[in-house]
Design a protein with these regions (language model features):
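Flavin-dependent oxidoreductase catalytic core characteristic
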Residues: 1-20, 140-141
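Glycine-rich flavin
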Residues: 23-160
Length: 160
């Protein structure tokens, strides 16, 4: 858990950032359908991609209550900011934290905490968001992977 005093300072700083930087950028995002790279880099610098990642892996080590308050503060701006962060944390980092091997955690959690952006491709045309009915496959082939299938609504796909 992040120290309570440090957390309150962080929330104050984040609130100012939302009001002074994120909300004013919304018009540009609506026009371009993209969060400006400068803002993504600022979000990295603020540590927003590693909120719940343990400190030993470079994250902030927030507990769930702190994370919810952080997301609530961030949510005063349009949802694209929160979505980018929560996919990284809620879908990808959580999978590594809760089900990854120690080697996977050591490789991926520091990168994700530093702001490497992950994507999560769940939704498919025939199965919606039913993970048990997914048809897409990934097969290791030589030095890479062969992906077969169709996805929709892939949050963070342009960044990952």
């Amino acid at each position: 858990m992040m120290d309570a005093d440090i957390f309150e300072q962080f929330i104050d700083q984040l609130g100012r950032y939302v009001r002074e930087r994120l909300i004013p950028a919304e018009k540009e995002i609506l026009e371009t359908d993209k969060i400006p790279d400068a803002i993504v880099n600022e979000m990295r610098d603020l540590g927003l991609f590693g909120l719940t990642i343990p400190e030993e892996f470079g994250g902030a080590g927030m507990n769930i209550t702190q994370y919810v308050r952080t997301i609530r503060t961030l949510s005063y701006a349009m949802p694209c900011y929160r979505s980018m962060i929560s996919i990284n944390i809620g879908m990808v980092c959580s999978a590594f934290k809760n089900g990854g091997t120690e080697a996977q955690k050591a490789e991926w959690l520091p990168r994700l905490a530093a702001g490497d952006i992950a994507s999560f491709g769940l939704t498919e045309p025939g199965s919606g968001s039913d993970s048990a009915a997914m048809q897409t496959s990934a097969v290791k082939s030589g030095n890479g992977w062969v992906l077969n299938g169709t996805k929709r609504y892939i949050t963070n796909a342009p960044y990952a």
